A protein has these predicted regions:
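Charge-rich, low-complexity amphipathic helices
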Residues: 70-71, 125-126, 172
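Helical scaffold of the NTase/Pol beta-like nucleotidyltransferase catalytic core
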Residues: 12-24, 29-114
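Active-site nucleotide-donor binding segment shared across nucleotidyl transfer reactions
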Residues: 97-148
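Short, glycine/charge-rich beta-strand/loop segments that flank catalytic centers
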Residues: 83, 112-124, 161-170
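Extreme N-terminal basic, low-complexity initiation segments
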Residues: 2-6
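Conserved catalytic core of two-metal-ion nucleotidyltransferases
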Residues: 88, 92, 96-98, 151-183
């Protein structure tokens, strides 16, 4: 069971709020505790005004409540959010496969990070984990090769590729013409 933090100075930043803790429990546990947490959460919020972190959990909530046979008018809205997440993730995963394939064909090792790693490694369902972009780690000695390969493909960056600057940053944002991002 997730508990909210008493550290009020961080609520909304690094610790879960009481509402987020209720939602996380509703999305992750099974049986009556899950249903109870969901009812408490649903009765204490306005669905149109949930915070971003909570909104990202709604697809996982939908899957958990569906597995438990919950019927409620809000289930259709949760389903719509789940389906949108699944669709967006399909597009991002296709883009990810393309980039990883291109880098692999040039003997550049990659490691998936964050959401894409979670989806591939832990979730069987691409709709339960919301992603806005995907993240790939490459060997530091191949960074310039990666930048050149990406620049010759559909991906571009606004980042200055000055060697001295690259040493002091943890990532570079790339974007395609469709507005899809990856770091």
């Amino acid at each position: 069971t997730v508990r909210s933090s008493n550290r009020m100075e961080c609520v909304g930043e690094c610790w879960t709020s009481p509402h987020q803790a209720m939602l996380l429990n509703a999305a992750r546990v099974n049986g009556e505790p899950s249903i109870s947490h969901w009812r408490q959460w649903a009765n204490s919020i306005e669905l149109d005004n949930v915070d971003t972190a909570s909104h990202r959990l709604l697809p996982l909530l939908y899957r958990n409540l569906t597995r438990q046979g919950v019927e409620h008018p809000d289930m259709d809205r949760y389903k719509g959010i789940y389906r949108r997440t699944w669709y967006r993730n399909q597009i991002l995963m296709h883009k990810l496969q393309s980039v990883v394939g291109m880098l692999g064909s040039h003997q550049i090792d990659t490691m998936l990070l964050k959401g894409s790693a979670m989806i591939v490694g832990y979730y069987a369902d691409h709709g339960v984990r919301s992603m806005n972009d995907f993240d790939i780690l490459v060997p530091v000695h191949q960074v310039h090769d990666v930048i050149n390969l990406l620049a010759s493909s559909e991906w571009h960056t606004e980042f200055p590729t000055v060697a001295s600057r690259i040493r002091f940053t943890h990532s570079m944002l790339f974007q395609d013409a469709g507005g899809h991002d990856f770091d």
